[in-house]
Amino acid sequence: MSRTCLAVILAAGDSTRMKSAMSKVLHPVAGLPMIAHVMQAIAASDIADVALVVGRDADKVTKAASIKGLSVTPFVQTERLGTGHAVLTAREALARGYDDILVAYGDAPLITPGPLLAARAALADGNDIAVIGFHTEKPTGYGRLLVEDGELVAIREEKDASDEERKVTWCNSGLMAINGAKALDLLGRIGNANAKGEYYLTDLVEIIRSLGGKAVAVDAPEAELAGCNNRAELAVIEKLWQERRRHELMLSGVSMIAPETVFLAYDTVLAQDVLIEPNVVFGPGVTVESGAVIHAFSHLEGAHVASGATVGPFARLRPGANLGEGSKVGNFCEVKKAEIGAGAKINHLTYIGDAFIGAETNIGAGTITCNYDGVNKHETRIGANAFIGSNSALVAPVTIGDGAFIASGSVITDDVPADALALGRARQEIKPERAKIIRERNMAIKAFSGKV
């Protein structure tokens, strides 16, 4: 789109209903602050400049909103005198001469570029105001969009609506696009002759019509326009976001056995032919390549899973876990900041942290990389085709060469050369009849003490 546009994002609310120590727009949806979701939609709508109207937590909100591709200028709203007043807080930016002014809200993280582009297209068609609306079966509480002959003639708040107007199911979302050349003049004409003494952006529709201009409404899915005022609504928005993203991934070739139990982050990348079993949680920063399987009850964050690898069930991949092709991290295993080579197997009950494990190496059950000395972390390096016996403790920093064999139960504190066998435990002793003596002694103690 060749037209210039300024997005004015309203994010100055006190968030009192959220009952939180931080602004509601900083609360995460799928691991990303609400305001950042809105900004992603703005950036994808051919908009580069943003006037961010902020109040509490101004610096934090501005930082969260400053995503790549956007130039964000904050404007602090010191008084709360309505939406019209909030937009005028960015007067300096509005005066720069943009073709379009798009007003949106920082607490509506489900918005997509579609409705925003549609509103801008309506301005390009010669309209002065384009209001984004939605149809709903439950319009109670919303302002109604009153349309005659295809033009929007008014936005009627429910308390002011007639019985006939209350039957209208096309409702105001609060988002709108305004002719940039007329924006400051129109905003300056909004009055506050109402019960609250506030300046309402919705008055612009009747103002522009009184001046001979045109207003229209464009439609959008109700779910995309959901705002968030409290924790219950935040949970609903999270649910809607997850449902939408799961659906997109399944249509792209990802299999989910029980999709309603899979929880994704804003940046989760799952390739075609990935299989996700029930009750899997993805934190931020996870990429899973084609043909990989994530078994049930696994948790992944900041991890990469290569083609054909398997994870879980009941596995945890922490930031820096990088699984090679065909590798396996099995049940009750935790991997953190570790490179796992192609075909390597970590099947059971193991902690691997700050480590490099070569291709085709086998890590036995109960193996622990002892990476922390109480102050610093240290690295464990294991070569290709090595075998680490069960219940081994590898005390870092330590290097185990290609093809080396670590006997079960060993505590390894020194480097092990390639193809060497290392045993780090006491030799087994057999003492005939000793068990019988111990048993008889214990029974005598028990009888003497009177304990059963």
Curated annotation (Swiss-Prot):
Q: Where does Mg(2+) bind?
A: D107, N229
Q: Which InterPro entries is this protein grouped with?
A: Bifunctional_GlmU (IPR005882), GlmU-like (IPR050065), GlmU_C_LbH (IPR038009), Hexapep (IPR001451), Hexapep_transf_CS (IPR018357), MobA-like_NTP_Trfase (IPR025877), Nucleotide-diphossugar_trans (IPR029044), Trimer_LpxA-like_sf (IPR011004)
Coiled-coil features, chain-numbered ranges: none
Give the molecular function GO annotations: glucosamine-1-phosphate N-acetyltransferase activity; magnesium ion binding; UDP-N-acetylglucosamine diphosphorylase activity
Q: Which organism is it from?
A: Allorhizobium ampelinum (strain ATCC BAA-846 / DSM 112012 / S4) (Agrobacterium vitis (strain S4))
Q: Name one Pfam family in it.
A: Hexapep
Entry protein name: Bifunctional protein GlmU
The alphabetical list of record keywords is: Acyltransferase, Cell shape, Cell wall biogenesis/degradation, Cytoplasm, Magnesium, Metal-binding, Multifunctional enzyme, Nucleotidyltransferase, Peptidoglycan synthesis, Repeat, Transferase
User: Per its Swiss-Prot or TrEMBL entry, what cofactor is needed?
Assistant: Mg(2+)
